[in-house]
């Protein structure tokens, strides 16, 4: 048995089927995994649903608890005891996994001999999930130096022997954050922890109603669990210096991503604040003060208040931090926040620096193809600075080549009161061979020596072009296409520059006007103003100005008048190969439809007969296609 899946179930009749369906429909063969469902004395039809799946699928196991435990810990422990799999995966009854998750998880873990493997999480219906640790796949991450402490949920693949040999179970004496205690204990005993970030393994779903993560928990239970984690770190085999750093990492997580975040604001009464502060203080005093030097500055300031038993100061500070723009200024290239709550303490300037908390808030209002450029319009401000200070920023557009990391800079065409317009000239972006490839767009903002750069595009108005829309241009070396698009994972603006050899076109013709149209289907192509069709007749090259360009999301139509072409070819007495190109002979047009025949003109001409009598003969000028080529026939 490769994997045992553990699901604690309590009153999940509306949710459990979606979860189980994702588990029984895996690409991994069913004989390789088991699904252990532990019903915690449900009062709805959950148990009946579980038994239906058990009857239908041989790899579904159902355990019925006789007494409700009040939490998922005890049911999970029951399942661990009977699990037959080499690995154990914990799944909540209101979540589900990707169809390839088990096979990928197992193969990756076996290949890397992992004790624990974190599979990439995905939030559904607005459910927030940890992301920082899933930026790249890493078969061997460091517990202290990585971001994995920021995900302490049990939705991971654990080696069964790791849990059983080290007697790692979910604590049942606490009813809050028991999964964090379990996961930290497993982290501390694991010899190798891996991260697989190339597939959405586990889907956490935000449901209507109250989720355990946001339900009220008494402070003594919550901070009791936090003290258990600190105790586990202290008792671990880590070197003392690494223990201190790990506790600091945990404190960063705790204050920014737990119930303690802005705790004095969440508590509505003085009595609640005092009670929570008492247990918070007890927890913090269990952490050695040496850890304080390794936490983030805003966490260090909180610890200052807590270690000085200053609830009033912490309350004032957390409110001031919510309104940080009032207190933040730019000083010698640094963002400094001078909070009144800190005036009674002797604080170094270094602790007041908040550069790391700032980010550029941006919104793309419009992206527009315009002649030979792409117009990029939007707004951008510094999150921590007020409107008046933001008015002083200067902007630079930066294109960074994804492979070579080369950079190209453009000044804004206009900038006023945080609203910008950049004109990206395609010919400047694609001027040499080394420019081929993907260019990622950034905006860099600077104020009084302080600089910050951000990727742009993931917050925007609707993009009005199709994913195939491109600009077709040329330089002295080659013809190129420039296609703006938004990246897959982060949804930011990039431009893909590629060499372009030819474009397939269908033909249509208006006999009366002598208008010939080239129809490029499944493409929206933008061209420079005053574009032309180049015609190579074999003896000469003729330029036909583009009379009209009709653009639709999935079609481009170029129309030219061919009267001058007909005049030049009037002397042709036999079929001749001709070539069409756009703006340069390198940018060829090929015939998309084979054996197409278009009559360009019909004339009556005088011919001598064998009896030396003149005779009027009707002749046709035709444009033919064959094997992607064009032919002129008289």
From Swiss-Prot:
MF terms in GO: poly(ribitol-phosphate) beta-glucosyltransferase activity
Gene3D superfamilies per the UniProt record, alphabetical: Spore Coat Polysaccharide Biosynthesis Protein SpsA, Chain A (3.90.550.10)
Catalytic activity: 4-O-[(D-ribitylphospho)(n)-D-ribitylphospho-(2R)-glycerylphospho]-N-acetyl-beta-D-mannosaminyl-(1->4)-N-acetyl-alpha-D-glucosaminyl di-trans,octa-cis-undecaprenyl diphosphate + n UDP-alpha-D-glucose = 4-O-[(2-beta-D-glucosyl-D-ribitylphospho)(n)-D-ribitylphospho-(2R)-glycerylphospho]-N-acetyl-beta-D-mannosaminyl-(1->4)-N-acetyl-alpha-D-glucosaminyl di-trans,octa-cis-undecaprenyl diphosphate + n UDP + n H(+)
Pathway the protein acts in: Cell wall biogenesis; poly(ribitol phosphate) teichoic acid biosynthesis
CDD domains given in the database record: Glyco_tranf_GTA_type
GO biological process, one term: teichoic acid biosynthetic process
Disrupted gene: phenotype observed: Deletion of the gene abolishes all WTA glucose modifications.
Keyword flag Cell cycle: no
Enzyme Commission number(s) from the entry: 2.4.1.53
Keyword terms: Cell wall biogenesis/degradation, Glycosyltransferase, Teichoic acid biosynthesis, Transferase
Enzyme class, spelled out: transferase
Protein family (similarity comment): Belongs to the glycosyltransferase 2 family.
Job description of the protein: Attaches glucose residues to poly(RboP)-wall teichoic acids (WTAs).
Protein name, entry field: Poly(ribitol-phosphate) beta-glucosyltransferase
This protein's encoding gene: tarQ
